[in-house]
């Protein structure tokens, strides 16, 4: 790359980042250039690139790149060149040879032996002090810079002649959280999101906000203790990339494991993975079919409380659990024919109690397959520096941040609230590590967190358990009292009637025409400052307009009695009716208008999935519905769970089929005020 090309590639954010975090950033296209020729993790490459290429000067970068390539050529051992490497150490006769390799340690008969992966020797002498300093050497191993010497061992008669003189894990020596937080404060939230994505190797300019948030959610297990994440989606979307490549503190398992490996030996002499690593991830979860049931049983307790029983004493760990897997069907097919945990193996899928402990279901089908334009050529943090930041943030707690501005809805039970709080906390650490967040920014995190937990609960509900039926998840603004319901995108649009409550002032209503045709409408009232006038949209006409006018006249005549005189006199009411079936049925919907107006005036939503039937006279007398069977059948088919019915129609309810009665609960009313109170769930 020429100097001119380099200057074109840089943007304002690159310059701002290199100034704020000098020496801790690297150009990500360099990583890909080196990665092509070296089969080492990204954090290893960036350790070297950060050491030799942390500059904005193109000539310095090119010189540093040459040093990195030379270092990898000289010091990185290819698996098929182990004999050459061993011979080189032997020829030095006591002097050390430096190389990069993954080092594991095991205890054999009270003596520690190191195993160097590509050096291909399982009995290398190592000081116990390194084992004490870096206990990950005992489980999974650590990529390190190793100084190796050859020394004839009299006891083994030359059998084990290799000794590690010095071992340096590939990671930064120290991390300053205050410096990191101060640096973060110099950037806007949008800028920081883009920086984190570039650090991961992605180009944010080709992503919308939601896709950015999905990518960032993959980092939560690295930043939040005891966080349980699942992501299922198409192949080649980089599901396990964050765990595998972005941190030396995460372990990725590609097959079944044992209780001893996960949670430690019964004797207590060797710790399990959950006590050693920050994240334990399972790739290709479908391959876990043969995993012992005991592992899931122990994980169930661990995922709930972070504790587990091995031997006589209970033990604890703070590793997060992540599960990644592939979907084999389009998402709409999965939603319509089953549930979203079907790709899981039986040992997990059939354990609803375990699934209920998952904090977030990341919709992997929304993430595109990796393509060239998704990768960045701009600057991001050196990965080992960013990994240390996320690791240091694990000690901090942001779970109470939500309470500054919001409360969670009644359908979120204790486990749901815990999941949402942990997701918000994790996203705070990734995006707002300095703790400064506006109400609008926090609202975005809360909504995103609620959605991911609701996706878990919706699947549990589909699996057929009555205890999970409350899934209308919401959160409320403490200042305004406004309640917002959060859905899951993949389930939208199947029923005309939403399962969540509508905004205050909106209701569903139905009618049956003289020819037996049934109509289904969503009536929406918006209040603005005014003088007590009714303003009807152009689509509202004929019988419907007349019934609305009668209901408004009745409401106006009773405004003082209802305690709403001032609010009605100082407001104008804008009315719109959305024909959900587009069949233009003449509708008498006076009671629905009255309830909608009452809802708007009280700033209180009507109970979810409620249909309001009936009309009224100018004096407030209720008119019965021509027939119940047809509108209730249509209502049931489109997701209605509850119907307000004039008490005059009570005798007709005996004609309604048992199927409808099983799915739609009737609520009878005798006057408009009673209808409004019952619709709003008020006494």
PLM feature spans:
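Dynamic helix-loop-helix/coil hinge segments at AAA+ ATPase domain boundaries and subdomain interfaces
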Residues: 179-213, 541-545, 624-627
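Conserved NTP phosphate-binding and transfer environment spanning the P-loop NTPase/kinase superfamily
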Residues: 359-487
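Peripheral, non-AAA+ core regions of ATP-driven protein-machinery
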Residues: 492-683
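Substrate-engagement module of ASCE P-loop NTPases
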Residues: 301-317, 344-354, 387-393, 599-600, ...
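Conserved ASCE/P-loop NTPase catalytic core
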Residues: 203-333, 338-342, 356, 474-489
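Short glycine-/polar-rich loops that comprise or flank the Walker A/P-loop
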Residues: 227, 277, 317-319, 354-359, ...
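Extended, charged/polar low-complexity intrinsically disordered regions
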Residues: 2-200
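A short helix-turn-beta junction within AAA+ P-loop NTPase domains corresponding to the substrate/partner-engaging
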Residues: 335-368
